[in-house]
Amino acid sequence: MAQEKKKGGVLPPDGGWGWMIVAGCFVVTVCTRAVTRCISIFFVEFQMHFAKDYSGTAWIHSLVDCTTMLCAPLGSLIGNQLSCRIAVILGGFLASVGLVLSSFATSLEYLYATLGLLTGLGFALCYTPAIAMVGIYFCERKALAYGIAMSGSGIGTFILAPVVQLLIEHYSWRGALLILGGFVLNLCVCGALLRPIILKEEEACPLPVDSECGYSVKPPTLNGGPTRSAASDAKQRCFQSMQEYHFLLMPDFLVLAGSFLLLASGCSLPFVYLVPYALDVGVGHQHAAFLMSILGVIDIVGNITFGWLTDRRCLKKYRNICYMFAVGMEGLCCLFIPLLRTFVWLVPFSVLYGYFDGAYVALIPVVTSDVVGRQYLSSALGVVYFLHAVPYLVSPPIGGWLVDTTGTYTATFFLSGFALISSSLLLFSVAIIRYCQRNQKKNSLSKIPKLVSCEGKQVDYYPPKNKDLMLIIPATS
């Protein structure tokens, strides 16, 4: 903690208004991630109305996810340069407009632009700044705070999935999208809660310290004092921007980034194809939507329990292992789903997959913060979610193409499972290599002769195999 205060100049309050930040981030995850998950419920309606196949409608979900992640650095940039409050309010307005315009769609291409691109852009401006604010307000209880905040995705899915299905049945898919547009407008209210930190240390300090980057900024003088030129200010801003992305040179972050790429390739497929798969094997519409609700509520348990557990002192240093375990188990669940062909058997899948999904989702910002530090968290999260963009874009259409080609969902769920397991194995392999390197380094250091002093002269001491003997050789200068 002392070291973090020295670097960043400030300490997070770990409570107080921070819990309002958690509440705001909770609603942001409901309005962004839960709504994105529920878009798959519209797929059957879109296929019937526009006479398109699986791969064509899957592009809608891909575009929402891809745009949300691809524009995540833009959300971080607006949050850093202006404020997180402005970013979230602007994003909420754009997302609401996108959903309302989607209710007037006349073609799938129209939905690609409104529901896919415009709504996804609004979600991007909201998601990253809100998550970063939680990390700024919390340190000791960071994992628990993130667990509560990210549980909004599961709670939202549990509530919205059957509600959206009922809205479609009573008001058609157009009316359901219009109502969702009004609901998502609550993001603007959440943005108003994201109050920047004002600390007493900054008021007492003659040179204010930037809470994100850790450097002192000298204010310009007004009465005849020296002022920096515009060119100097531009260079300073450029240097500060470069410093914000210094974490890209960290080897640990590069490995984590590779793992995220594999993770993103497989994690979205079950959410896209669980309901269509259930309908294909004969499960009713309400029961299929209820599977998403079960997945969502168990997601909450995974969010909070893993967040609370990894904040314990005995597990805090094993957060990476907990993350690897959750991702690996999620992959195993996907490998077994083609064997589950009734509602009774699909319920355990929703329970297990939802739990481990909630676990790793809550740990993504925590693990990222542990690797790059709090001062780089906002920019790092922008890059992390940016890495999800291309896999989110291509994996659902590839899954739909596999369904159209093979006539079954087996290959699609196998693709998801192997991608998730590979993500976990990458981190596990690097951890094993690091462990072996540390042991090898310890063994090599134990063999290096130690320098000791004997009667004022420097000598080399070699510990002999026989403990009763000591060999002392004068050191050569």
UniProtKB/Swiss-Prot annotation:
Coiled coil: none annotated. Residues 1-9, 434-477 are cytoplasmic. Its main location: membrane. It holds the Pfam family MFS_1. CDD domains: MFS_MCT12. Functions as a transporter for creatine and as well for its precursor guanidinoacetate. Transport of creatine and GAA is independent of resting membrane potential and extracellular Na(+), Cl(-), or pH. Contributes to the process of creatine biosynthesis and distribution. This is Monocarboxylate transporter 12-B. The gene is slc16a12b.
